[in-house]
Amino acid sequence: MLLRLVSNSWPQVILPPRPPKVLGLQAPRRARKRAEGTASSNVFSMFDQSQIQEFKESLALSPRLERNGMISAHCNLCLTGSSNSPASASQAFTIMDQNRDGFIDKEDLRDTFAALGRINVKNEELEAMVKEAPGPINFTVFLTMFGEKLKGTDPEETILHAFKVFDTEGKGFVKADVIKEKLMTQADRFSEEEVKQMFAAFPPDVCGNLDYRNLCYVITHGEEKD
């Protein structure tokens, strides 16, 4: 239901050019599926496979995800002139986060429904949607929930390809300095502060290398590899 709300509300909701608060994206160590509950999810059960695939492709190809760290970086590194679909994780989160406090809560959902013309949404329905998350719905939790639902249609190779361009030796790592230079000089340029936030979320190792394979796994699965 969250994704349906996003796709329906996009023409009616004007996003600010830059959100006032940027969250630090901390990848969950072992964000596990809510096994029995996922299939009948109030949040996701309304979407068919084609809608899910469209979301995944837009997540992989979006030219810029405004809100968070390395997810933004991945999208900025993808090919210029790619999909302009609004159904990206960050854009979706921004739409749902009506009060711009960095979290999606019951009142945010109520306001989003109201923007779509549905005024009298029952508290029980809103509470059921919120309770599907393991905790407060910040961007990390939001991304994890989508990652859990979207397993099976992961465009992981598409995402990896954007990074492999810079991995000339095929080691699975790219130099953080190279990524920083590209992000600050090409396409929708990052500021110095945005780059710092990105590396705070997914820091390079002591040699300055960034493990982009694990990053891509987090993007598409919502959790880190063992």
Swiss-Prot record:
One of its GO terms (molecular function) is calcium ion binding. The keyword Repeat applies. Residues 84-119, 154-189, 190-225 form the EF-hand domain. Keywords: Calcium, Metal-binding, Repeat. InterPro entries: EF-hand-dom_pair, EF_Hand_1_Ca_BS, EF_hand_dom, Myosin_RLC. GO terms for cellular component: cytoplasm; cytosol; mitochondrion. Ca(2+) binds at D97, N99, D101, D108. PANTHER family: MYOSIN REGULATORY LIGHT CHAIN 2. Myosin is a hexamer of 2 heavy chains and 4 light chains. This chain binds calcium. This is Myosin regulatory light chain 10. It comes from Homo sapiens (Human).
